[in-house]
């Protein structure tokens, strides 16, 4: 089931070592975790909608999502301390590779007019973030079960501090990047 993890351990480590010129296998870039988050925005006040968003993200990730809560009150955002603000889930290990495989091979190809994920999502420290406009591209999501169409932010945290190494690793995993060049 975890074909990407097997692929990384059996083939990609050797390719990365050769292409990046890293001889020590412990210094090779690895995927540490994937964080999926949703900002609820105007829907934060409705507990049923928040629970529906959490359930949807839990289905997509295969792991229970957590509703995030505001730590401070900010009048400009009409936000009070303790108010629900969004949903997040952190994936590690086999769940992480399972989600990445589903994202690359099933979800992203189902996006209409998809031209690749943007290359400018790297943060300068080897982590990659991008956003999706809706959740309907995932096979677990049933249209009739969702109350609100929402997007999500996906952040991939790697062990490297270099964007080019992280890009090379994600590219070898099969991440469909758009044409252009990488930051850094």
Curated annotation (Swiss-Prot):
Superkingdom to which the source organism belongs: Bacteria
InterPro entries in the cross-refs: Ribosomal_uL5, Ribosomal_uL5_bac-type, Ribosomal_uL5_C, Ribosomal_uL5_CS, Ribosomal_uL5_dom_sf, Ribosomal_uL5_N
A GO term, aspect molecular function: rRNA binding
GO biological process terms on file: translation
Pfam families per record: Ribosomal_L5 (PF00281), Ribosomal_L5_C (PF00673)
GO cellular component: ribonucleoprotein complex; ribosome
Keywords: Ribonucleoprotein, Ribosomal protein, RNA-binding, rRNA-binding, tRNA-binding
Function comment: This is one of the proteins that bind and probably mediate the attachment of the 5S RNA into the large ribosomal subunit, where it forms part of the central protuberance. In the 70S ribosome it contacts protein S13 of the 30S subunit (bridge B1b), connecting the 2 subunits; this bridge is implicated in subunit movement. Contacts the P site tRNA; the 5S rRNA and some of its associated proteins might help stabilize positioning of ribosome-bound tRNAs.
Family that this chain belongs to: Belongs to the universal ribosomal protein uL5 family.
Subunit structure and binding partners: Part of the 50S ribosomal subunit; part of the 5S rRNA/L5/L18/L25 subcomplex. Contacts the 5S rRNA and the P site tRNA. Forms a bridge to the 30S subunit in the 70S ribosome.
Official protein name in the record: Large ribosomal subunit protein uL5
Organism whose genome encodes this protein: Wolinella succinogenes (strain ATCC 29543 / DSM 1740 / CCUG 13145 / JCM 31913 / LMG 7466 / NCTC 11488 / FDC 602W) (Vibrio succinogenes)
Name of the encoding gene: rplE
């Amino acid at each position: 089931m975890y074909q990407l993890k097997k692929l990384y351990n059996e083939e990609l480590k050797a390719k990365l070592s050769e292409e990046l010129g890293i001889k020590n296998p412990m210094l090779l870039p690895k995927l540490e975790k994937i964080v999926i988050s949703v900002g609820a925005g105007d829907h934060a006040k409705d507990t049923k909608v928040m629970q529906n968003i959490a359930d949807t993200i839990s289905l997509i990730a295969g792991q229970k999502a957590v509703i995030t809560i505001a730590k401070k009150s900010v009048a400009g955002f009409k936000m009070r301390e303790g108010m629900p603000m969004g949903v997040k889930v952190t994936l590690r290990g086999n769940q992480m590779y399972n989600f990445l495989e589903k994202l690359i091979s099933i979800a992203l190809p189902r996006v209409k007019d998809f031209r690749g994920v943007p290359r400018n999502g790297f943060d300068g420290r080897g982590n990659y973030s991008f956003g999706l406009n809706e959740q309907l591209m995932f096979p677990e999501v049933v249209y009739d079960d969702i109350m609100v169409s929402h997007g999500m932010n996906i952040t991939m945290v790697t062990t490297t501090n270099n964007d080019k190494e992280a890009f090379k690793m994600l590219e070898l995993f099969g991440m469909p990047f758009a044409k252009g060049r990488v930051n850094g």
